[in-house]
């Protein structure tokens, strides 16, 4: 898609995005100008949430035996192993049942009062919140093992087709990480950990931002996204039209001649 690209990843994709750009950098390929990582588990050991604890306290086999199903007959992809969308949805709702109950009760009251604006805002939110997709089983299980159990990226043990994933090889891609102050899915510091891994990017080409009062969804949707987060993303991309400054020390001409 060309070199003039800025990549944004939200939640789970932050890890494969960082992995892909690391491999591109190691291979000497043209990499994106910047990478924006939002609310993702780069280092899931930091400030573990209920999501992290579940993944760490259950075995790989438990997930394979309890949340993986085959698509029924008469549906597209029949027979394919997936982590079903309805289970994902049930899991998210179960994390904050009181909040969802209150939200729906308030929605009912708004309908009675004729408060159409608040009622419509509720419908828009849940139209997105309830939109789930069956996830390929191998992708889901690989994520559980690599990200939440083995911590392969931060420990430096992750390899792709025999090639080690080395974030320290990234030099020309600027890095912006974004976290929500109240995020109960990706805890504080999990996304910011990318800065500790990307040591080849100069400090002036790296930035971390915490959205005050924002939960997980607030950093990429709704008012807090529009008013707090989007301006930061916009300005960061505009400030790095040619990529990042490298943190690698440059040899002076005399040193190059001596070499």
What function would you assign to each model-found segment?
Residues 211-227, 247:
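Catalytic histidine-centered segment of alpha/beta-hydrolase-like enzymes
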Residues 9-17:
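Gly/Ala-rich beta-loop-alpha elbow adjacent to hydrolase catalytic centers
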Residues 148-167:
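Active-site nucleophile elbow and catalytic-triad environment of alpha/beta-hydrolase enzymes
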Residues 184-190, 202:
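Conserved alpha/beta-hydrolase "acid-adjacent" motif
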Residues 197-217:
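Catalytic histidine neighborhood in serine/cysteine hydrolases
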Residues 7-9, 38, 178:
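Short beta-strand immediately N-terminal to the catalytic nucleophile in serine-hydrolase-like folds
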Residues 170-171, 176-179, 183:
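Short beta-strand/loop motif that positions the catalytic acidic residue
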Residues 3, 16-138:
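Alpha/beta-hydrolase-fold enzymes
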């Amino acid at each position: 898609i060309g070199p003039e690209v800025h990549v944004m990843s939200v939640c789970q994709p932050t890890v494969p995005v960082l992995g892909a750009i690391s491999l591109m950098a190691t291979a000497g390929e043209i990499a994106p100008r910047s990478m924006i990582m939002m609310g993702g588990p780069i280092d899931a050991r930091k400030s573990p949430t209920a999501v992290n604890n579940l993944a760490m306290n259950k075995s790989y086999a438990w997930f394979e035996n309890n949340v993986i199903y085959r698509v029924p007959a008469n549906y597209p992809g029949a027979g394919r192993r997936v982590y079903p969308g309805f289970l994902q949805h049930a899991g998210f709702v179960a994390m904050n049942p009181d909040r969802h109950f209150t939200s729906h009760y308030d929605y009912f009251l708004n309908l009675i009062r004729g408060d159409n604006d608040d009622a419509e805002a509720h419908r828009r939110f849940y139209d997105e919140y309830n939109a789930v997709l069956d996830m390929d089983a191998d992708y889901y299980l690989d994520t559980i093992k690599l990200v939440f159990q083995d911590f392969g990226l931060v420990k430096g043990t992750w390899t792709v087709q025999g090639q080690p994933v080395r974030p320290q090889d990234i030099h020309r891609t600027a890095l912006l990480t974004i976290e929500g102050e109240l995020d109960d899915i990706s805890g504080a510091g999990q996304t910011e950990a990318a800065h500790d891994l990307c040591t080849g990017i100069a400090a002036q080409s790296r930035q971390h931002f915490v959205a005050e009062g924002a939960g997980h969804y607030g950093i990429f949707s709704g008012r807090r996204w529009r008013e707090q987060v989007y301006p930061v993303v916009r300005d960061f991309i505009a400030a790095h039209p040619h990529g990042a400054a490298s943190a690698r020390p440059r040899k002076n001409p005399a040193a190059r001649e001596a070499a």
